[in-house]
């Protein structure tokens, strides 16, 4: 692309995702996380939750199943999929998020850094997502740094 | 677990994960929706020059399991990682952590590392939790 800095401010179409218990269970099984709060209501209540909570990294599921696919996102950012790596991931949890919640996500590119190194340059593209629940409360914020090798 | 019981420099118990298999990468792809073929399709791994590599977010998920083994999920407010090295199927990941800082308002800041059995660091992260106080 002509200038990767032009990506700053690029907004993605908002997307919506209803969190299902079964999806949470499938996700923790894939990771091998056997914490019972993710599938047993009694265990969740014992920890002070009012329902089955999402695991810390589950917000990725909301992005990828509710929003753009990996390929679509690469096309929108005009990046070569075999040249990219996940550089950093930040999550901030503001309110509890439960199975049964419907989250709406707004997502945009907030920063681009261009770095030059001895083995070639790279672009660092930061996307910020804001997650609101069905009551309109902002419940989480995530930031993702994608590394695009030149 | 109370804020007063935690000290800067305290290490958390190591979480040892099972060896990563290709089937696990297929499961994680389906569960997460990350269908980047680099994680599951041999030819794409060869084209990228890396071979098949594990999802970084799978390793972050393991690190998150470590964090929520050490302090309750309910108390975790922030979690961020930097991905350092690629992980391949066949590697076994262990998660270690320690307390870096205690802040006002019952906040603790911890470090979390995911490394393979040779000690190669795959990701380095920071988490923040708010713990109950004995004085509350």
Where are these regions (language model features)?
Chain B
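Generic detection of short hydrophobic beta-strand segments and adjacent strand-loop junctions
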Residues: 14-20, 81, 127-129
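Mid-chain, well-packed structural core segment of small domains
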Residues: 67-95
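Hydrophobic alpha-helical context, especially transmembrane and signal-peptide helices
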Residues: 47, 52, 81, 110, ...
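Hot-dog-fold acyl-thioester-processing enzymes
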Residues: 1-75, 136
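HotDog/MaoC-like acyl-thioester-processing domains
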Residues: 1-13, 86-136
């Amino acid at each position: 692309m002509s200038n990767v800095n032009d990506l700053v401010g690029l907004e993605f179409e908002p997307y919506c995702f209803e969190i299902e218990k079964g999806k949470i269970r499938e996700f923790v099984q894939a990771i091998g996380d056997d914490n019972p709060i993710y599938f047993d209501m009694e265990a969740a209540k014992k920890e002070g939750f009012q329902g089955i909570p999402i695991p810390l990294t589950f917000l990725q599921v909301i992005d990828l199943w509710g929003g753009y696919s990996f390929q679509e996102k690469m096309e929108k950012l005009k990046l070569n999929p075999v040249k990219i790596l996940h550089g950093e991931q930040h999550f901030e949890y503001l309110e509890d998020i439960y199975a049964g919640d419907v989250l709406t996500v707004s997502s945009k590119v907030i920063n681009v850094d261009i770095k030059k190194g001895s083995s070639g340059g790279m672009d660092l593209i930061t996307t910020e997502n804001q997650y609101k629940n069905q009551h309109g409360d902002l419940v989480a914020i995530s930031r993702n740094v994608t590394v695009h090798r030149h | 677990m109370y804020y007063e019981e935690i000290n800067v420099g305290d290490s958390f118990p190591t979480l040892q994960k099972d060896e990563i298999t290709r089937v696990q990468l297929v499961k994680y792809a389906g569960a997460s929706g990350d269908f980047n073929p680099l994680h599951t399709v041999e030819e794409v791994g060869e084209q990228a020059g890396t071979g098949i590599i594990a999802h970084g977010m799978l390793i972050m998920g393991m690190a998150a399991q470590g964090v929520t083994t050490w302090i309750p999920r309910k108390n975790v407010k922030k979690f961020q990682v930097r991905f350092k090295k690629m992980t391949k199927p066949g590697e076994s990941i262990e998660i270690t952590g320690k307390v870096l800082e205690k802040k006002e308002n019952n906040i603790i800041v911890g470090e979390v590392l995911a490394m393979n059995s040779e000690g190669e660091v795959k990701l380095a992260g920071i988490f923040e939790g708010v713990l109950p106080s004995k004085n509350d």
